Structure formats: C-alpha cells, structure tokens
Amino acid sequence: MSKLQISVAMGDYDRNRALYDGRVQIDGCDPVYMLLSPEEMFFRAMRSRDFDITELSFSSYLVKHSRGECPYIAVPVFLSRAFRHTSIYVRKDRIKIPQDLRGKRIGIPEYQLTAIVWARAILQDDHGIAPEDVTWVRGGIDTPGRPEKIKLDLPPGVKIDSAPEGTTISELLDRGEIDGFIAPRAPSGAALNNPQVGWLFDDPTATAKDYYRRTGIFPIMHVVGIRKELAQQHRWLPAAVMKAFGESKTRALELLSDTSATKVTLPFVEEQLKAARETLGADFWSYGVAPNRRTLEAFTRHHFAQGLSARHMAIDELFDPSTYESYSI
C-alpha cells in the first residue's frame, strides 16, 4: 500500500530534527519537509494554503478558526513557546516602569501576532495597562511596509497608526519617535546599540519565573495545523502527526540531557536545563491539551478580550477531536 504524500512546513528546531533527518516517521506518510522562517510559513499558509501540514501562529489560527475561515485544523503540538517579557523594549530615557507606557506609542510589526497578544496580556494582568491605553504603531522590524496578514475588526478604543512610509519601527525606536517596541524579534540596526534602548524589565528572566510561579502559564506561540480536507479524509492522520512530533521532541530532550558532550553551541546548558526543570517541572515543554489547559484558557480569554477572536473559543473546539485523548501502555 502506498503512503500518503504530504508537504510539511516547520521551523528548524531541535524538537523537529528527528522528523526531518528521518529518525522518526509519521505513520502512513511520505513527507516532504520544508524548513522555513515563521514569517514565510505563516504568510504562505494563510494567503495561499501552500502546505498540507504546517506550523501556524496560534493567534492567526484562532482569528481564522473563530470565524470558521481557517483552512487548517490544529493539533496540540506547540512547536514554539516563550515568555515574552524579553519581547518588550522601551526608550530607557523616558520609560522606567511599565505604568509609564500609559498614553505612549509602541511599535509592533502586526497587531495580532501571538507574541504581542501575550505581551499585552502581561501588561494588562500584571501592570494595569490595557490595549486601549497606548497608541500602536504598525510597521516592519527590518523592512518598511509590513502588512497585517489577516483583516481585523478591532474594538473602537484601540488606536493603531502606521509607521511613516519608508520607515521601520526599529528606526522609530532608535530616533525616539516611539516609546516602546514589542515583537518576536529584537529591534534591528542602530537601535540594537543605542544605550537608550533596552528591555522594559531589567531582569526579564527573574520576572518571567515569577510570572510562571504565580500563574502556571508557559506561553504557547505556535501550533501545528493539518489541511482540513486531509484530516477529514484520513481520520488517522491527526493522531499520527501528534505522535510523530511528540517522539521527535522526546529525542531532542534525551540529547539535551546527555551531558557527555554539549549538543548546543552555548555554555551553561546543563545549568539552564536544571533551572528549567526546577521552575517548570520535568515535562517543561509538554504537548497535548490536559497539561496546557491553564495556558490555553488564558490565551483564548485574552485573544477574545483584545478583539481578535470572533467569539470566546472553548478549549474543546480548538483542536482536532481525535487529539484530546491518547493511549497508554
């Protein structure tokens, strides 16, 4: 019997490596893997539906899924997760504490990006800064004129300006024409070396650890989506995809735990791994709904409150039904 030929777009992460190097197979499938940047993957997936299986922005997925317009159905495989305290940059010459952002101008590449949804949630829940309290300035990080991937219908109190033509938000931050900058990537160009530009939180790692201890939330950035028609035609496929991605992640964690020779080109990996386990627990990068319900509930609540979801999505309608339970031996 021939295998199902599929295209798979994903990032080049250690947790995916056993898939694309062939050590882990997706049962019943003959995949063609494409390792792409998030920006390219998400743009092509949402604009032209280029892939059978693809990594997706959790926020973009939720916008489309809540409207019944998404060509993909997600499985609870969370390829990217991050505490977004390091995503908030400010002009240190005028912003000393989070509350100083009230009434100010903050640059963003797109309003609906997952990282920015989480950053706004942090600012609102922990510091009382609502999305309506600032003016959002939308533009490219490195290149001028970045468009919003998805048409949005935002609440009337949200104020969004476009960066001046030919200008990036990194340049605006460097010149002091905006007060803050929130993005999945650091500001580029001269802003990186500007002594007046820095993180809002002086010790973002300590702040993030405190956030996790208080909330139990490890923010989810990306999910895996399967073309709806494929998932409907081959009902075994969502579970097979989830199983394969889970096995690949397990291989990556096994290698990371092998300290006989460092697998990552970075010092202090063993200490960081120990710190992650002490703070987040042994299964610190879990897939599946049950161990991530608190994080999923927080995100869907904020996503709807920020005017991005058409309705407040229930957790049991986010993913393919076959992926909410798993077998055990």
Features from the language model and the residues they span:
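Secondary-structure end/capping motifs
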Residues: G225, A231-A305
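Short, glycine-/small- and polar/acidic-enriched structural segments
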Residues: S7, D14-G145
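Pocket-lining segment of extracytoplasmic ligand-binding domains
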Residues: P147-S257
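Short helix-initiation/N-cap motifs at beta->coil->alpha
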Residues: Y33-R44, K96, V134-D174, A314-Y324
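Basic/polar N-terminal segments that are highly enriched at the extreme N-terminus
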Residues: M1-L4
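Long, low-complexity C-terminal extensions of enzymes
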Residues: G288-I329
